[in-house]
């Protein structure tokens, strides 16, 4: 039911025509999936007369470019994954239209620092930023992307890059599309080590984040999701007495969970978490949002406790992210952050 092509054709005062390359693209896409193309599929091949096709490498609907009275109009499908795949071609057309060269772009992925703090660090720094350098931020759970764009790669621009690396230091995970889990993977791979997880309140989210990254099999050993207390005992060897005395959300239990996971795998380092995700289950001593984490190796084990008063889904995401960063920092010999998302840390 997309009306984009029709409306742009009307604005340009030209008819819609069956674009042969677009038709071939639609038929090939359908054929690869054993689909007989119908009218709805083939409608995607009808473009404004004079339009130039923009290939879609992942979907059936192509994009197109059309000059309307000196204005370049570019269209893409609305599906985010398809848009991302087509952006290089779209940007190339815009650059060509404007007659400019290739822009210099730097995207630094950071963790553990907020946008306002990042801006304050930059504002307080005495570095001179060239006029053609544009800085920006894109906040996304759980990372902050710091973007630097300039008209060209010059020595001044490289000095700006070095300034960002100095200001944000060990908060930097990597460049471009590096994720927190991807950064952990890279360190594990460089050190020839493997990770094991033992999760209760996060329900396997840490393992899921790790295995969502390509190449996980070389660095991820196993993941134990031990939600119920009896499974903590039978699978990981957590003591019944410890559970009764300290409770499932306690330092003693996550330590035993971690030791059990390490003993039952060939992993070099592990992370264990147990908490109260809510909305119920909290007490005066252990309110909703309480979480204990244990991480490290058998002979170098650490624990940490915090309270994250938020909704259940966000709680799980925050705990998983904090756990991965704790592993990353231990592997790199870095101190843990003083707090993760909350200042109610102990």
Each predicted region: which residue ranges?
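Short alpha-helical segments enriched in small residues
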Residues: 27, 155-346
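Short, structured loop/turn "capping" segments at alpha-beta junctions
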Residues: 37, 97-102, 217-221
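Electropositive phosphate-/nucleotide-binding environments in soluble metabolic enzymes
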Residues: 2, 16, 20, 41, ...
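Short beta-strand scaffold segments in enzyme catalytic cores
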Residues: 62-66, 146, 290-296
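Proline/glycine-rich low-complexity loops and linkers
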Residues: 2-98
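Short coil/turn connectors at secondary-structure junctions
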Residues: 13, 42, 48-50, 60-61, ...
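Accessory alpha-helical/coil subdomains and C-terminal extensions
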Residues: 67-142, 149-157
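Flexible gly/pro-rich beta->alpha loop and the following alpha-helix that scaffold active-site loops
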Residues: 1-15, 164-177
């Amino acid at each position: 039911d997309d009306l984009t092509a029709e409306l742009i054709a009307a604005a340009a005062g030209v008819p819609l025509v069956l674009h042969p390359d677009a038709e071939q693209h639609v038929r090939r896409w359908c054929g690869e999936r054993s689909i007989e193309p119908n009218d709805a599929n083939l409608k995607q091949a009808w473009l404004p007369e004079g339009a130039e096709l923009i290939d879609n490498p992942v979907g059936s609907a192509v994009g197109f470019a059309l000059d309307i009275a000196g204005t370049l109009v570019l269209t893409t499908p609305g599906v985010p994954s398809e848009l991302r795949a087509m952006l290089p071609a779209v940007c190339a057309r815009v650059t060509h239209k404007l007659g400019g060269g290739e822009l210099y772009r730097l995207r630094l992925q950071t963790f553990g620092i907020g946008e306002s703090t990042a801006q304050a660090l930059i504002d307080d720094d005495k570095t001179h930023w060239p006029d053609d350098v544009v800085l920006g931020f894109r906040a996304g759970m759980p990372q902050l992307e710091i973007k630097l764009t300039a008209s060209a790669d010059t020595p001044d621009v490289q000095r700006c890059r070095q300034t960002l690396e100095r200001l944000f230091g060990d908060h930097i995970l990597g460049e471009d599309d590096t994720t927190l889990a991807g950064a952990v993977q890279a360190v594990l791979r460089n050190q020839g080590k493997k990770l094991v997880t033992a999760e209760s309140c996060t329900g396997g989210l840490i393992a899921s984040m790790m295995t969502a990254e390509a190449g996980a099999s070389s660095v991820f050993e196993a993941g134990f999701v031990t939600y119920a207390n009896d499974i903590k005992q039978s699978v990981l060897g957590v003591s019944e007495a410890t559970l009764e005395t300290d409770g499932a959300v306690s330092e003693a239990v996550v330590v035993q969970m971690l030791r059990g996971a390490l003993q039952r795998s060939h992993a070099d380092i592990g992370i264990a978490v147990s908490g109260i995700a809510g909305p119920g289950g909290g007490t005066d001593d252990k309110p909703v949002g309480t979480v204990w984490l244990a991480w490290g190796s058998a002979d170098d084990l650490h624990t940490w406790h915090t309270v994250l008063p938020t909704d259940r889904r966000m709680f799980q995401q925050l705990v998983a992210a904090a756990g991965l960063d704790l592993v990353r920092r231990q592997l790199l010999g870095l101190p843990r952050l003083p707090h993760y998302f909350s200042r109610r840390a102990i």
